[in-house]
Each structure stands twice: as structure tokens, then as C-alpha cells.
Amino acid sequence: MPSRFLPFTGCSNFRDLGGLPTASGALTTWGRVFRSDTLQELTDSDVKSVLTEVGLTTIIDLRTGREITNEGRGPLEHEDIAYVHLPFIADLEVHDEVPDAIERDVLADYVHMLDTAGALIADAVKAIASSPGPVVFHCAAGKDRTGILAAITESLVGVPRDVVVGDYELTNQVIDEVCARLARFDTYTTVRANPASHFRCKPEVMEGFLDLLDERHGGAAGWARDIGLADRDLAALRNVLG
């Protein structure tokens, strides 16, 4: 099986959601839906690969307005790629001033996003489903906001829970590089103040998030129904990803 990580120089966590098993026995489609950390430092070579090899048509940016103002959208802003901004957290909620990030309750953060940004998460699912070609969604590290959207998207196309959790944990393979990059930017002072190990993806966090979806909604499909996603949206998502 090909590596799910794409070997870009200017980001470390750009990876394909293809090749994941689903309940139907099929695999999710390669080369159609991607997740990533920030794209602001893509090199000229990276941009060429994104355009010619990935064939990217849509970017879904989950960062806050403040992050985008401070850090920019990166070189893909100047390309003919659709751009969708869906901030899953408010500007004041970016964890850049927490003195000890290890004390954060990450699961509580995820629940808060589900509670306060549910409509935006649903809009992101629809944006993935309606993209005319390859689409990437990203935040800063490609871990939390991106991880929630990936988990919901994968669950909606029938990827089993253990595989969803395993995909979430894949960020740990590149967390050192991701944190080293973010630590250079003043927007992310928490990353600068803590070792990369503090930001590792813990499987019990994603397990807890999926448990919550089960308890409240009977799973991701029930959440989608309750938030107002139509059957045609979910059918379109399955057609795109598998």
C-alpha cells in the first residue's frame, strides 16, 4: 500500500484519506480527499506537485481568522483553487497563551467544537462531498480541528472505529516536525513553550469523541441527520471517498 503521507518540504502532515477499509469491504478512494497541517510554507516544488500530481481543486481552511491574518494562506492563494474558510473555533479560543498545554483537556476541546461549531463541521462535510476534484482540509497542526473532521468524514463512509482512531494517531509520526515548524510562528506560543510530546494524539481522546457521538446521536450518521445533513449530501460523500 502506498504511503498516506505526501513528501512535501513545506508541510509535514499532508496525507491521503484513501486506502482505509470500510464496512462494505471496500477501501476509501485514493487521491480524492486529503488532510494536512498548515500550507503557508509550501515551496515552489510543493506547489508544482499539488497542482500537477495531486490536482487539488479545493482547500478547506479550518483555522481562525486571526491565524489566517497573522500567518497567511500560503502560495496556493495565488492558484486557481477554490478556497473555503470554516473556522471551527473562535479567535479567542486559539490555545497560544496557555502556560502549560499538557493540562488541557483535549477531549473537552473536541466536545466544545462539536457543540459550538456543529453547523460549520457539517458545512465542511458538504464542501468535501461537493468538491469537483481532489480536496484538502487543514488547520495548523493537522491534528485537532482536522482530526475531528477526518473522524466524522471517515465514519460517515463506513470506516470502522479502530481504523478512525489509527488514522488520528498517524500524526504522531510527524509531530516533532509539525511542532518545530509551528514554534517559529508567534501565533503558536504554546507550541514554542512545550515539548512536542505534549501534543501527541492520544487514542483515548478520539475513542472518547466517538463514544460521545454514539451516546448523543447513535454515531456519526445520527449526528449528520441531527445537524441537518441531507441523504444526498451523505451519498455524495460516499461517492467521493468510498
Each language-model region and where it sits:
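Cys-dependent protein tyrosine phosphatase-like superfamily
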Residues: 1-136, 148-242
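Ser/Thr-glycine-rich phosphate-binding loops at phosphate-binding pockets of nucleotides
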Residues: 141, 145-146
